[in-house]
């Protein structure tokens, strides 16, 4: 039986709280770079009565994201996206943080946007660290908003020599 589908990236507690609140009656497909994380959280959700499929999904890879979405579509129309995936400054170098948190989020939104059902919704959870840094200029905001996804990581402002440390990349 086809159901409405929620896709959920990043098998953590914040994503689970959203999925528990919003995903009852839906097929929930949870993806995480570490399949064991997706499997563990899927078991917790299943024990609470949710229909959950765990998958390995690497947010830094367009191919992996497309595979995740294609698999989810086998269960029905994607009606909801929960993006709670990401890496923190203590977990990875600057390049990885940008590849996952910026590029990966842009790819996920772009690819889901192509297939989400009419009336579908999505939420992306981000960090409060943005409030610790200086505000971006209007020009920087425009570059991040309007640069094609595949060109984002080539922006001069995102080159490692222009990013002070991992906290600033975050």
Predicted regions and their residues:
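Conserved glycine-rich Rossmann-like NAD(P)H-binding loop of the short-chain dehydrogenase/reductase
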Residues: 24-40
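Rossmann-fold scaffold of SDR-type NAD(P)-dependent oxidoreductases
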Residues: 7-9, 77-86, 120-127
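Conserved Rossmann-fold cofactor-binding substructure of NAD(P)-dependent oxidoreductases
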Residues: 60-76
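Canonical Rossmann dinucleotide-binding motif of NAD(H)/NADP(H)-dependent dehydrogenases/reductases
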Residues: 1-29
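Rossmann-fold cofactor-recognition segment
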Residues: 45-63
């Amino acid at each position: 039986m086809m159901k409405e589908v929620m896709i959920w990236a990043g098998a953590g507690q914040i994503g689970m709280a959203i999925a528990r609140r919003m995903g009852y009656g839906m097929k929930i497909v949870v993806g995480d770079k570490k399949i064991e994380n997706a499997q563990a959280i899927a078991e917790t959700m299943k024990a609470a009565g949710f229909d959950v499929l765990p998958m390995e999904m690497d947010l830094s890879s367009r191919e992996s994201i497309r595979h995740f979405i294609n698999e989810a579509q086998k269960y029905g129309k994607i009606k909801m996206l929960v993006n709670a995936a990401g890496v923190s400054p203590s977990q990875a170098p600057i390049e990885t943080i940008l590849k996952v948190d910026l590029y990966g989020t842009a790819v996920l939104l772009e690819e889901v946007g192509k297939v989400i059902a009419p009336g579908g919704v999505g939420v992306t959870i981000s960090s409060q660290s943005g409030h610790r840094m200086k505000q971006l200029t209007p020009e920087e905001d425009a570059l991040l908003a309007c640069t094609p996804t595949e060109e984002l990581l080539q922006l001069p402002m995102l080159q490692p020599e222009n990013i002070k440390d991992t906290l600033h990349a975050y």
